[in-house]
Amino acid sequence: MKLQRRHFLASLLAVPAVAALAQTGPPLVEVWKSPTCGCCKDWVKHLEANGFRVHVTETASHTMRTQLGIGEQYGSCHTARVGAYAIEDHVPARDIKRLLAEKPAAIGLAVPAMPIGSPGMDGPEYGGRRDPYDVLLLQKGGGSEVFQAYR
């Protein structure tokens, strides 16, 4: 009987550890986008193909952009949040992963102006064209710096 009680108590101690493991896994990216935007849908597919879980809310993104602290000069096609960070427009999945690994004190990342060749803007309709662009790290105090350059 004592052995069964020990096993029962040990299993109770394991519950929080199992729950913690269940909460880990691929990061969840919450996306706010227009229901009619094809490039936004392609960006979501890019994130999923790179291991992210994605939850999409189809609505105008400007309200969330403001709530997340993204300046209008960085605003573009869609807005997202992953963990404590805001993501604006066609940011590559690899840069989001780097952001989550490095954990800088920042609002998040942005790729203004929907550059051709960025994820979601790289479909066959663009004929392989790739414009140079920068992924910007948005500072909490305002301003930005280049997080990653694509040339």
Region roles according to the model:
Residues 1-16:
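N-terminal secretory signal peptides and thylakoid transit peptides that target proteins
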Residues 19-22:
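Boundary at the C-terminal end of the N-terminal hydrophobic targeting segment
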Residues 27-41:
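Local sequence-structure signature of Cys/Sec-based thiol-disulfide redox active-site neighborhoods
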Residues 36-38, 61-63, 86-87, 115-117:
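Solvent-exposed loop/turn segments at secondary-structure junctions
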Residues 43-46:
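Typically the conserved alpha-helix immediately C-terminal to a functionally engaged Cys/Sec
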Residues 50:
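Conserved dinucleotide-binding and phosphotransfer motif residues
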Residues 54-65, 74, 82:
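Thiol-based oxidoreductase modules, predominantly thioredoxin-like and allied folds used
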Residues 73-151:
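Thiol/selenol-based redox catalytic cores and closely related redox-interacting motifs
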